[in-house]
Each structure stands twice: as C-alpha cells, then as structure tokens.
Amino acid sequence: MLPALRLMTCALLTFFTTLSHASQCPDWSHARASSEITALQQQIASWDDSYHRQGLSQIPDELYDQSRQKLNDWRSCFAVSTPQANPLKTATGPLAHPVPHTGVNKLADEKDVKAWLKGRTDLWIQPKVDGVAVTLVYDEGRLVQAISRGDGTQGQDWTPQARLIKAIPQQLPQPDSLILQGELYWRLTDHVQAASGSVNARSKVAGMLARQTISPQQADAIGLFVWDWPDGPADMAQRLAGLQAMGFNHSVAYTHPLENHAQAADWREHWYRNPLPFATDGVIMRQGQRPPAQRWQASAPYWIAAWKHPYAQALAEVRKVHFNIGRTGKIAPVLELTPVRLDDRTVSRISAGSLSRWEKLDIRPGDHIAVSLAGLTIPRLDGVVSRAAERAEMSVPHASDYHESSCWQAAPGCESQFRARLVWLSGKKGLALPGVGPGTWDKLIESGHISGLLDWMTLNHAELANIPGLAERSSDKLLDSLQTARERPFQTWLKAIGLPPAGNAKLPDNWHDLAERSVEQWQAEPGIGPGRAAKLRAFFQDPHVQALSQQLQAQGISGFK
C-alpha cells in the first residue's frame, strides 16, 4: 500500500478556473491576504513537522487535506508565486532509500476520479492502509535494512525495530536480493472504517517505531502490507505472484483488477463499510505498467492516484457569530458558515454550545472549524482547526445581563430574548396560536406595534392591515388567531407567560392565591425542592410578571380577575 503520508504539492490539488476563484476568493487587501496566507502556511508547516518527523498527527488527514487545499486556493486568488515548502523537509534521515518513495495524487471527487481513469489500461486497486511507510532491503533473501519513509529520499534506520516485528520476514524463501516498499500498520480485528474511524492506528505504530526498544507484545501488534516491489517484474500479475510466493499474502488478497469508475466506487465503498484487519483512509488506484525504479522520484507520479474516503469531518469557514438569547436568558452562540457538504447534507449554521464553550474556543469570523454529523444527521462543532491572523472585534453579551427576569420589553439589547418570549407564548407549549410564529412576531415588532409581551392583545383589524407584509386576508386570519388566546385556560396562560416548571403541584385557578404563596408553601408541593420553590416565588413576585397579570386582568382573562 502506498504510504499514508501527506506528500502534497500545489500541482496535486484541484485547480479552479479563474471564474470559480473569483467567486470563492476572500475580499481582502493584499496586506491582509499576505498575513492570512503566512499564518496558514506556518500552521500547516507545524502539522507537517509533527506528522512526518515525530510521527504524531495533530489533525485528521481529511482536515489537513482540506486546509492545504484552502491554502492553495488563497495562493491562487492572490497570485502568490513563491513555491510552497516541502511538507517532508523536516522528516529526512541519515539513510538513503535505494528507490525513492513516491507521493500520491489525491483526487478530490468523482469527477477527478473519472478523469484520471479515462484512457488508462492495466489498472489495479488496493485499500489505502493507514500506517507508516517503510523500505525493506533484502540481500540474498536476508533482511539487511529497514528505512522509514522520511522525506521520500532519505529516512531513519528502523532495522533494529524491524528485527522484532514478526510480520517482517527476516529471511525470504528464496535467496533473492530485492527492495520492497510497504506500510507498517496497527493490527485491528474486524475494523469497520465507516463506524470506527482510524482509532489513532497510525500514531500507535509511529510511536512504537520511535522507541529504541519495543516489547514482543507491541511488535506482534504491528502488521505489514507490501504495496510495491520497485525492482520486481514489469507485469503487475507477475509481481503479485512473486509477492505471494514470498509470503506477502495481503498484497494479493487486497489487490484487484480495475476497469472503470463504477468498480472503483464499489471497492471504495466495500472497504469503507466492511471489516478489515487495518485502518484505511481511502483506496489507491495504480497502473500495472510504470517506469523503471531508477526513474522514480520523491513526488507524486502519474501512474498512481488516491481516492480518499468520504469526509467524516469538513473544514468550514466561520462567516459570522450570532448570540441567540433564549426566553430564560440562556445565551447560545451560533456560527454562520460558508456552506460545506457532509454526506448528503449542506451545513451553513452550527451551534457552538454554551457561551462558556464559545469563550474557551474563542471562535471569530475567519476562523476555520471542524464540523461533523452527530448520529449522521445533526451538525456538530468538533473544534477549531486554524485561526484567522486578523482577529475580528466582537460585541459579546454578558451572561450576567440575561436571566429569567430580564427582557420583558423590546428594549435595546433585549431583541433576542424578548422575541424568544413571544415565540414561546404563541407556540405549542404556550397558547398554541394557529399560524402565529417567529415571522409573525418579527413583522409586529419591526412595525412598532409591539414593545411589551401582551401588546398584541389590543391590536385591531385596521392596525394589522397596515403592517407591511400582511395582506388584508392575512391580517383577518391573524386577528382571529390572536383572539383565540382569550379562550385558553388559566393554567395555559401561566405557562405561556413563563411559569417555571411546577412539577406535579396542584395549582389553584386564580392568580391571587399563587402570588401569595411563600417558598415554604411551594416546597410543600410534591416534586418541588428548595431551588424550584425559590424560582416559583420569584416569578410571582417579579414586578414585570405582576404587570402582565394586571394586563390580563384588564383583558378579562379567566383566573386573573
């Protein structure tokens, strides 16, 4: 299997036309562009060093690939001509590979896969094993050297570790001198990539090989997948037969002839969703015929390409941060994103959870985040991938300003919570007013007809008919719907204006008795503890709530008289 390493260059990434670039290019000055491009280049360089030199993956491959594609797009947008740094520059070692390790061209989508396959013959497909690449050198059938992939030209001496790994034959059946390239992987039992992901399998192997000594148990947990025999027969079928004769059965079992895109898609799906003894991150498609090993270079060749698994995580750019304040004062940050595709869904908005989580992550417009689907349906924020070099200033609400007793009026700073109170009031858990939803309240607020929670109760047909966006027929229906509120029972009205949960308490049907209750009296009710009792007492003593009760009394609502 080809190395699961990130040897990517700008030439290997998907290029966009000038028109598509124009639609996707950020609206930055050249100074801002230079700053942002430099920051992302430095972040990627840090990931490269950790991954290739230390064997530690700080970021999933799919997010790395998307980040590098983003960098490539920005460089193209702003005509950056300086060459990008080699991702493997810090991974070199003292030993030269007898045959360089090539990289792999990662195809972006099915369109690219079809284009790559077009006109090619003698094609084969393998799973892209997620491990660490190695060169094995045999002299007269005896293992004499194991070299890490390094920068593709030179790597580290892994021979001492290789002596302990049973999956690496120390002596071949025949006294042949040859060179093999393959993947050392962490053995897994019935591993389904779609369900379990990569489970840090590559990092485990890299960590073992970075040690001076490894235990027999650790060595036994490492497997070998030979994916090339550079100086072997020119014919692929003969190479596979030779590898099988040497005992490398995986090479034969997981290498299949490939005729078209449909077959490639089937194998990719099969290996993604069915049990395998190793983690994978896609498939490798290769031509059986290739240049002689003497011409190989440490760069992606034309005869090999990778088609990665579907993204489990997408890289999304944050466009705006909204702070939605619920009716009880809870602040919920929501991120507005440049739309991204995950599975068959388009994600353009995502919750950041609580205000404290947002503050910890410090997500600003221009940052890039990782997004996945929880339960395959609900967009989920997994974390920050990279930050904008220029940090946007933001107006952030203070948690102490919003609570259960705040924002009963449409005052500045109260827009979100006041609107949430209205939506709750007309919703299924409140008065259940037919056809009255968020859009209705927005029109009434924007037209200046509502500034308090119950102002709508005094609106008449003429006032509604003059509201922009409400035709005469619509205003008639709205008025009829609003009038049904008068028929709702007292208990329903209590919930609609925000009564805290009262458990199984039996509530009297009049406001006066409830307003007179003490904390101790509330606590005597079944299912009500000290905290809830205090909230109920505070609710009925709140001046804003008392004012609402007086309005409802004036409107003749049952229970408030």
Curated annotation (Swiss-Prot):
> What gene is it encoded by?
ligB
Q: Which Pfam families does the UniProt entry name for this protein?
A: DNA_ligase_aden (PF01653), DNA_ligase_OB (PF03120)
Summarize the protein's role. Catalyzes the formation of phosphodiester linkages between 5'-phosphoryl and 3'-hydroxyl groups in double-stranded DNA using NAD as a coenzyme and as the energy source for the reaction.
Enzyme class, broadest EC rank: ligase
The answer to keyword DNA repair applying to this record is yes
What EC number(s) has UniProt assigned to this enzyme?
A: 6.5.1.2
Query: What is the species listed in this Swiss-Prot or TrEMBL entry?
Result: Pseudomonas syringae pv. tomato (strain ATCC BAA-871 / DC3000)
Under the heading InterPro entries, the entry gives: DNA_ligase, DNA_ligase_B, DNAligase_adenylation, DNAligase_N, NA-bd_OB-fold, NAD_dep_DNA_ligaseB, NAD_DNA_ligase_OB, RuvA_2-like
Q: Name one GO molecular function term.
A: DNA ligase (NAD+) activity
**Enzymatic reactions:** NAD(+) + (deoxyribonucleotide)n-3'-hydroxyl + 5'-phospho-(deoxyribonucleotide)m = (deoxyribonucleotide)n+m + AMP + beta-nicotinamide D-nucleotide
What domain of life does the UniProt record list for this protein's source? Bacteria
Keyword Magnesium assigned = no
Q: What is the protein name stated in its UniProt record?
A: DNA ligase B
Q: Family membership, please give it.
A: Belongs to the NAD-dependent DNA ligase family. LigB subfamily.
Q: Which PANTHER family match?
A: DNA LIGASE, DNA LIGASE B
Q: Could you say which residues form the signal peptide?
A: none
Active-site residues, Swiss-Prot/TrEMBL = K128 (n6-amp-lysine intermediate)
